[in-house]
């Protein structure tokens, strides 16, 4: 198994040699990721004194909105090459990619051993770019851990990326032969094309080379026992245009679609035995969000078309079961009008709730409602037992996509300890 996998890796090493711009250093370099103590003159002084916090600053300062991840990917790849990691830049293509803009996942491992523990997060962010900045809390008597770091990606998910890398360096300092693999993917915020590219490649062999996968997302330092599933679709209505002064000469697509939207909007609150979407003790109710409606051309024209984008967070069941429920709801609400229907082919999203492992002591346990790359990574079975999957990271999802995205130094430092604990637990299962 290992020899075959090593051969696969060797064939992919088009960019695996050390980068000449960085001096070589041992894998086990001290990270100084532990909390600072004492007073400080400025927040910048604290960041500059810590290789870990400086690295986090550097990657947050690089704009990497989805489809524009190239520069931050190169920075991370160079950083890891300079620490003697073998680095593979795995090309990822997409329809939104501009000419000469290369996108790639960063896959890195520290030795010739087959990586058995995969540590992964994403390097893309949502728009718009928000510059890196620092703020201090004057009420905390110069406690460096309370310094607040703001900027796009400071939480989601460059906080996880930085903490994962430095946790891995901490582990490798004590155990240079630890079989770790680092994977930082593009496109998580726009459908997961980066993780799917890795999942479908020879870097994710069957049976799985990995007995443990550690995903990084903002979980407020809790270990996540699972997250809801996802289903995306459109509700479409077709009418006939006419002058608004003579509406009886046309058919309003908006009037036709409203009963369907009203019914679908309530499916998460309707019991399953009465035609609603299922709930579960673990995840609560399935939730429905009608996020966008596009209809008509002008107020004085009877609208000929209407379309609504819908996102469902599934608390139970499968996407196929949910599709059947939605179709029935639309049909019942419109008395079977064939010009109003649910369209699923235009949306690729669809996966059931994702249950995750929480068998490592010392963490709070929670569930989350947001989606991740967890379902985009196909887990191949192993002969020695199931592959464990963990989801953990610093920061709160409640600020992750907002203009107030921020994280404290203390949370970042605690995340390094948390990731290290998860890695060390995985090493004991070898």
UniProtKB/Swiss-Prot annotation:
Binding site for Zn(2+) 1: 156, 189
Entry binding sites for Zn(2+) 2: 156
Keywords: Glycoprotein, Hydrolase, Metal-binding, Protease, Secreted, Signal, Zinc
Subcellular localization, as worded in the UniProt entry: Secreted
Cofactor requirement: Zn(2+)
N-terminal signal peptide: 1-16
First-tier enzyme category under EC: hydrolase
Pfam families for the chain: M20_dimer (PF07687), Peptidase_M20 (PF01546)
GO molecular function annotations of the record: metal ion binding; peptidase activity
Annotated cofactor note: Binds 2 Zn(2+) ions per subunit.
Listed EC numbers: 3.4.17.-
Catalytic residues (positions): 188
GO cellular component, one term: extracellular region
Residues bearing carbohydrate: 84, 285
Major localisation: secreted
GO BP: any one term: proteolysis
Family: Belongs to the peptidase M20A family.
Listed PANTHER family: ACETYLORNITHINE DEACETYLASE, PEPTIDASE M20 DIMERISATION DOMAIN-CONTAINING PROTEIN
Protein known as: Probable carboxypeptidase AO090003000058
């Amino acid at each position: 198994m290992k020899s075959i996998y090593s051969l696969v890796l060797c064939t992919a090493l088009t960019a695996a040699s050390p980068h000449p711009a960085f001096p070589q250093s041992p894998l086990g370099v001290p990270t100084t990721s532990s909390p600072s103590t004492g007073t400080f003159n400025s927040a910048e002084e604290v960041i500059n004194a810590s290789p870990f916090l400086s690295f986090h600053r550097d990657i947050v300062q690089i704009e990497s909105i989805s489809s524009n991840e190239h520069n931050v990917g190169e920075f991370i790849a160079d950083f890891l090459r300079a620490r003697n990691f073998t680095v593979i830049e795995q090309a990822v293509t997409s329809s939104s990619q501009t000419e000469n803009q290369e996108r790639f996942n960063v896959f890195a491992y520290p030795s010739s051993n087959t990586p058995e523990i995969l540590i992964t997060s994403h390097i893309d962010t949502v728009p718009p770019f928000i510059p890196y900045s620092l703020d201090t809390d004057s009420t905390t008597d110069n406690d460096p851990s309370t310094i607040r770091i703001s900027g796009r990606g400071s939480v989601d998910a460059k906080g996880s990326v930085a903490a994962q890398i430095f946790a891995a360096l901490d582990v490798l300092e004590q155990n240079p032969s630890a079989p770790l693999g680092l994977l930082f993917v593009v496109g998580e915020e726009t459908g997961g094309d980066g993780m799917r590219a890795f999942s479908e490649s020879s870097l994710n062999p069957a049976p799985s080379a990995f007995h443990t996968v550690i995903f990084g997302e903002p979980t407020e330092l809790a270990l996540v026992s699972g997250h809801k599933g996802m289903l995306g679709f459109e509700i479409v209505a077709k009418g006939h245009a006419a002058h608004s002064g003579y509406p009886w000469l046309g058919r309003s697509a908006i009037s036709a679609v409203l009963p369907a939207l009203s019914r679908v909007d309530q499916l998460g609150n309707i019991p399953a035995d009465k035609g609603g979407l299922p709930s579960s003790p673990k995840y609560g109710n399935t939730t429905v969000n009608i996020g966008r409606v596009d209809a008509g051309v002008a107020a004085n024209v009877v609208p000929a078309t209407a379309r609504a984008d819908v996102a469902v967070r599934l608390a139970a069941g499968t996407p196929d079961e949910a599709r059947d429920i939605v179709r029935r709801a639309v049909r019942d609400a419109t008395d079977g009008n064939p010009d109003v229907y649910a369209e699923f082919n235009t949306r690729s999203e669809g996966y059931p709730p994702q249950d995750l492992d929480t068998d490592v002591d010392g963490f709070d346990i929670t569930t989350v409602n947001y989606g991740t790359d967890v379902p985009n990574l196909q887990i191949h079975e192993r002969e020695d037992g199931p592959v464990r999957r963990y989801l953990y990271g610093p920061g709160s999802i409640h600020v992750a996509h907002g203009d107030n995205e921020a994280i404290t130094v203390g949370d970042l430092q605690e995340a390094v300890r948390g990731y290290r604990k998860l890695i060390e637990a995985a090493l004991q299962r070898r």
